[in-house]
Amino acid sequence: SDVYKRQDFLWGGATAANQVEGAYLEDGKGLSTSDVQPHGVFGEVVERVPGDSGIKDVAIDFYHRYKEDIALMAEMGFSVFRTSIAWSSLFPRGDEQQPNPQGIAFYRSLFEECKKHGIEPLVTLCHFDVPMHLVMEYGSWRNRKMVDFFSHYARTCFEAFDGLVKYWLTFNEQNLYHSPEAF
């Protein structure tokens, strides 16, 4: 169909870090709210420890297999790939001043791989997950300090991935953020 040949048509797909990456504690990543929610269940977020059966630890292992997955997306002719950055990969606790260099390196490599295959990354900064420490210590989004933590995280992303990411989204499904159980 001619619609797919249009220059302004974004042919692609979407995932989120918390849905596909797995590797929930590798390379310095901290726990996030998504890591500790039971599979397929929304509700109160409670602190858990590694080894708990409720932690989502593998997913589709995108963290280790993203190059294969991006190559498959290119085979399908994708021109765009919407994904997210796990805030707790860059800032394991969420309130650090300096980002985790291994988290930066992973996402830089991911976005470079997309570009190598002619795929434009479209990146969501917060896809229902925040570092668990921010929930336990500050009460998450009920605390105005979260604005500063998020701003620092966002600026870090913009600087670290400048030239690799052209399109940014702040929040996924922001209409759900009114719920105290969301995170």
Which residue ranges define each predicted feature?
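Short, small-residue-biased leader/transition segments that mark boundaries at the very start
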Residues: 1-4
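Substrate-binding cleft and catalytic face of glycoside hydrolase catalytic domains
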Residues: 70-183
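Active-site-adjacent substrate/metal-binding segments within catalytic domains
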Residues: 22-107
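Short, solvent-exposed beta-strand-terminating loops
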Residues: 11-40, 172-180
